[in-house]
């Protein structure tokens, strides 16, 4: 399915940037293609928590539950909340049209 949805990124100073994003890409990919500061040190391989984002509950509840591997990485995230997810694991669908994604003010990159 091809198409686009609206994604709003809330940057740590409260500024909002709304973009049109292709369905099927991840939040991490959309952030990078729009020059937003979402690190993604492991490039989506579930080996870090630098693409940690915070969602509104409405959209968090539309996603599949995080895998155990994602939960393990989220445990390392700075500023973890009940609606935290990794941006690399959120794949855009039509159902997520209008999603708001808050970028935390800091990330923690743990090098093993």
Curated annotation (Swiss-Prot):
Gene Ontology annotations of biological process type: P450-containing electron transport chain
Entry annotated with the keyword Glycoprotein: no
Database matches in Gene3D superfamilies: 3.10.20.30
GO molecular function: 2 iron, 2 sulfur cluster binding; electron transfer activity; metal ion binding
Cofactor note: Binds 1 [2Fe-2S] cluster.
Domain 2Fe-2S ferredoxin-type: 5-107
InterPro entries reported in the protein's UniProt record: 2Fe-2S_ferredoxin-like_sf, 2Fe-2S_ferredoxin-type, Adrenodoxin-like, Adrenodoxin_Fe-S_BS, Beta-grasp_dom_sf
PANTHER family xrefs: 2FE-2S FERREDOXIN-TYPE DOMAIN-CONTAINING PROTEIN, FERREDOXIN/ADRENODOXIN
Job description of the protein: Ferredoxin are iron-sulfur proteins that transfer electrons in a wide variety of metabolic reactions.
Organism superkingdom: Bacteria
Pfam family, one: Fer2
Binding-site positions, [2Fe-2S] cluster: 42, 48, 51, 88
Family that this chain belongs to: Belongs to the adrenodoxin/putidaredoxin family.
Cofactors named for this entry: [2Fe-2S] cluster
Keywords from the UniProt entry: 2Fe-2S, Electron transport, Iron, Iron-sulfur, Metal-binding, Transport
Full protein name: 2Fe-2S ferredoxin
